[in-house]
């Protein structure tokens, strides 16, 4: 009897050792870009460089908050814009200021929420390992409360608070604002499919985040998302065609990409195949499949292609979804997007000498950060689904190659660049000190109104640090001028922060992704 017990004990020990060795081998293979990391996946060791940067990046959302602040962690910020929306009988006091001004632009704010949600959905475990998930959800909640209130009925969406021309003439702290803040709304007679669909995407994505946190809130968000999508699709038109004066700020080139983007998110949120059919049916022409694009607040096509590729990557073999030719075309286009991002690919896009993917002069960091996030996500889709190779003009690349590209862009913005400067304010020993930001540039004890331009014009560093701000970034020659009036390079935006938070979350640790976002 004793011998049997000893045998069983040794057998158990051997089994545990075998499991440990297997897990170690799989983990090493994953780290080297090989094999499949097991589901459901546990975050690997935390990379503290990216975790620390993530903690910094998320603080900018606290800097940008409007309304009655709760648990405020930014000593130089206070309550502001408490009467926003009052003229329409709604509460639009929450939400976030767009950049260094005090405008609430609904289009980029909704995109900010969509990207925050996507990041939490894919990398919530990594965020939790870095103790930052709650911070991300707090920022998301502040925006979603605003967006819900901005949609008081099926065919009405308030898309803007403030007059941008009047706002930009003032240089003042948000807490001291006394100017009128008019409201702009879209209706069936004044359409804005782009901003309505982006808001629908934000609602759908956020509903997935809150599904395990607050089911009632999640259901409400999804209801708003479905109604907004119906509104956007039925009453088609671009908001910057309806309101031409707004084209100088966030000009929407087309609303078609937002309709596909929203339908894709609604499919993930509901499982309703009618939304997938919307993107793969006659509306597929909106995607311009076969022609890779860069992802941004204006152009959602690359994001949609990656998001729908998720369906293909994790579909059961032989299923209708797995055999869908149009979904296959979305994935092929997503492959092509990845190929232009990889520096050793034949179709590689232009890089600066310092290694930054360079697409646009204004806010030059937006495209490389957005692209790096997509590359990290795509790498993890490949890794988690067992796909080991991406073919670019016959040349093979691994998931590790995509992750290496994503890291290179993150490292550049964190200081590994010719200027030896971190473009993430508050991270590292050297970062921009004269960020184009009204609140940061004016001492908190100064009682100034709209005429505080001396704080814009001073050569001194900002008295308040806009921690977490990701500024516009360098020129094509990797140079950067840290001056407050250098709006092109030295202004930060909330959507930049959402993008960099997503990228850093992807790099915090290694883990597999869930097969379903729901």
Curated annotation (Swiss-Prot):
A Gene Ontology biological process term: cellulose catabolic process
Catalytic reaction annotation: Endohydrolysis of (1->4)-beta-D-glucosidic linkages in cellulose, lichenin and cereal beta-D-glucans
GO molecular function, one term: cellulase activity
Enzyme class: hydrolase
Main location as per UniProt: membrane
Family to which the UniProt record says this protein belongs: Belongs to the glycosyl hydrolase 9 (cellulase E) family.
Protein name in the entry: Endoglucanase 18
Organism for this UniProt entry: Oryza sativa subsp. japonica (Rice)
